[in-house]
A protein has these predicted regions:
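ATP-dependent NMP and nucleoside kinases share a basic, alpha-helical "lid"
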Residues: 1-74
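NTP-dependent small-molecule kinase module
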Residues: 63-133
Length: 133
């Protein structure tokens, strides 16, 4: 956080990450049942209150998502978790998105890749325009 993200942001760079605090809340809090208040407090300490301007959630029915993962071959520990775990994680992500609709973009991951790319770029372009305008 302090070595990479903050300096880049202070320098005016746009930072894109694969996962951030929302993933911890979804996976650890909702998926594994850890105390959400504790995760929120820990996240606030670790990030120093830093929050993304945009979180893109590629939403898919967990059963379908697991089918896609299995078709790729090798899986990791989280991907091998049972369907109920993935359903809880999905609910955790969707709950966060519903509480912060201005900073989340929820997309149907079953849509064609080109369509998803367009939707993401439209939202990112809008944010970049606000930043420079």
């Amino acid at each position: 956080m302090e070595e990479l993200l903050r300096p880049a942001l202070y320098a005016g760079s746009v930072v894109v990450t694969d996962r951030f605090a929302g993933a911890s809340i979804a996976y650890q809090g909702h998926g594994r049942g850890l105390d959400l208040e504790f995760i929120d407090e820990l996240t606030a300490r670790v990030t120093g209150g830093l929050a993304p301007h945009l979180t893109v959630l590629m939403d898919i029915d967990p059963a379908r998502g697991l089918e896609r993962i299995a078709s790729r071959g090798a899986t990791d520990r989280l991907e091998r978790a049972n369907l109920a775990f993935h359903e809880r994680v999905r609910r955790g992500f969707l709950e966060q998105a519903s509480r912060q609709p201005d900073s989340w973009l929820v997309l149907d991951a079953e849509r064609p890749a080109g369509e998803l790319e367009t939707q993401i770029w439209e939202r990112v372009s809008s944010l970049l325009g606000e930043r420079t305008g």
